[in-house]
């Protein structure tokens, strides 16, 4: 009986300590915050150098969903921008024949002043976030007139 009592007391004290120790070990290995730079660029994917427009800065973040087969008309941007593909795939091209393909988890710097298009390719809609550093009142996308 005495052995059983000692065993029960030892187990009653040791098991919670083991459980607490395990939790502390697990939480100590998890970073409270992880910062990962997805893209840093001084020029766009097609080689455009960036120039910030003059005026009152206006930052914009767009969430774009493009159904399979959707293709933008030819256009250009007057401001620097970056894009992040969440799902689906994009194929983009310029008038001078430069091309880009981007899929889930990929980022790219958008062209500035170069006429281009982008198309949602594949069987699922493309979900893309685009951040732009423009000027208040300025259009983010300017249609190309031939």
Language-model-derived ranges and their functions:
Residues 2-10:
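Sec-dependent signal peptide recognition
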Residues 66, 96-113:
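Short acidic-glycine-tyrosine-enriched beta hairpin
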Residues 4-5, 17-60, 109, 143-146:
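A short, N-terminal "cap"/entry segment at the start of jelly-roll beta-barrel domains
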Residues 112-139:
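Ligand-binding loop in jelly-roll beta-barrel domains
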Residues 53-57, 69-82:
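A short beta-loop-beta micro-motif enriched in histidine and acidic residues
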Residues 9, 13-17:
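Hydrophobic core
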Residues 71-73, 91, 106-108, 112-119:
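Histidine-centered metal-chelating micro-motifs
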Residues 77-96:
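Glycine- and acidic-residue-biased ligand/ion/polar-headgroup-sensing regions
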